[in-house]
UniProtKB/Swiss-Prot annotation:
Record-level GO cellular component terms: cytosol; small ribosomal subunit
Compositional bias annotation for Basic residues: 107-125
Gene: rpsM
Listed GO biological process terms: translation
GO molecular function, one term: tRNA binding
Protein name, entry field: Small ribosomal subunit protein uS13
Keyword hit for RNA-binding: yes
Cysteine pairs bridged by disulfides in the record: none
Keyword field: Ribonucleoprotein, Ribosomal protein, RNA-binding, rRNA-binding, tRNA-binding
Annotated region described as Disordered, given as residue ranges: 92-125
PROSITE patterns linked to this entry: RIBOSOMAL_S13_2
Organism: Chlorobium phaeobacteroides (strain BS1)
Assembly behavior: Part of the 30S ribosomal subunit. Forms a loose heterodimer with protein S19. Forms two bridges to the 50S subunit in the 70S ribosome.
Length: 125
């Protein structure tokens, strides 16, 4: 089944399968299924076309998903960088923006280690 341009896994429960759509987490998935009246424990393969269509409608009218959600997030980060606030500077320098320590951690954000050559020991005669 395809919703919002994403192929949902047929063998998973509806709640879990909906979280494969960017911009929909577990809480949003539960709310969507509750509004449509579908049991969250049902598998995606068990849903009929009418139920799938109603899920598509709810997502289209109430949620920002996939490309639109990614674009909005990129724009908000770009706005922070443009206004020059602290969080924007941290994004620009590829450092953690939420106050984490960086002396020993933050390898994911900083990337691979850039080796700096140490002092060479003087040869004693």
């Amino acid at each position: 089944m395809r919703i919002a341009g994403v192929n949902l896994p047929l063998n998973k429960h509806a709640v879990i399968a909906l979280t494969h759509i960017y911009g929909i987490g577990k809480t949003s998935a539960k709310n969507i299924l509750e509004r449509v009246g579908i049991d969250p424990a049902r598998k995606i393969s068990e849903l009929n076309d009418e139920e799938a269509h109603s899920i598509r409608e709810v997502i289209a009218e109430d949620y920002i998903v996939e490309g639109q959600a990614r674009g909005e997030q990129q724009l908000s980060v770009k706005r922070l960088m443009d206004i020059g606030c602290y969080r924007g500077l941290r994004h620009r320098r590829s450092l953690p923006a939420r106050g984490q320590n960086t002396q020993t951690n933050a390898r994911t954000r900083k990337g691979r280690r850039k080796t700096v050559a140490g002092k060479k020991k003087a040869v004693k005669k």
